[in-house]
From Swiss-Prot:
Sequence positions that bind Na(+): G74, T77
Catalytic activity: fluoride(in) = fluoride(out)
Subcellular location: Cell inner membrane
Gene that this polypeptide is encoded by: fluC
Name of the protein: Fluoride-specific ion channel FluC
Species this protein is from: Methylobacterium sp. (strain 4-46)
């Protein structure tokens, strides 16, 4: 139960941070999704730092890891988890799996949005 609460609180903070970046980037104007790119890249950088930190400091509490990674970064961007998982596949020498994971995730994600839009436009 404590872990669920820790993730819940972290996700709220991460979501608020994401909203702040979106609001700030909107002031810049333009049609390029700069906020999403900033969020994805900074979240991936933070995930790498945290994952490395938790490896080096193996004795840190599980609740801290959950709060920072699953909670805050999960609320901020799930792209950081995607990036970490792809990197770990590459690091383990599973290059074919990594390529399949990256291409498959991106293609399936875009296809999912396209199919959803088509359904809503048809029945909407």
């Amino acid at each position: 139960m404590l872990n669920t609460l820790v993730v819940f609180l972290g996700a709220g903070l991460g979501g608020a941070l994401r909203y702040g970046v979106n609001v700030s980037a909107a002031r810049l104007g333009g049609s390029f999704p700069a906020a999403t790119m900033i969020i994805n890249v900074s979240g991936s950088l933070a995930m790498g730092i945290l994952a490395g930190w938790f490896v080096v400091r193996a004795g840190l509490p599980q609740s801290l890891r959950l709060f920072l990674t699953t909670g805050i970064l999960g609320g901020f961007t799930t792209f950081s988890t995607f990036s970490l998982e792809a990197f770990l596949l590459i690091e383990r020498g599973a290059l074919a799996q990594a390529v399949l994971y990256v291409i498959g995730s991106v293609a399936a994600g875009i296809a999912g949005v396209a199919v959803s839009f088509a359904i809503i436009r048809h029945f909407g």
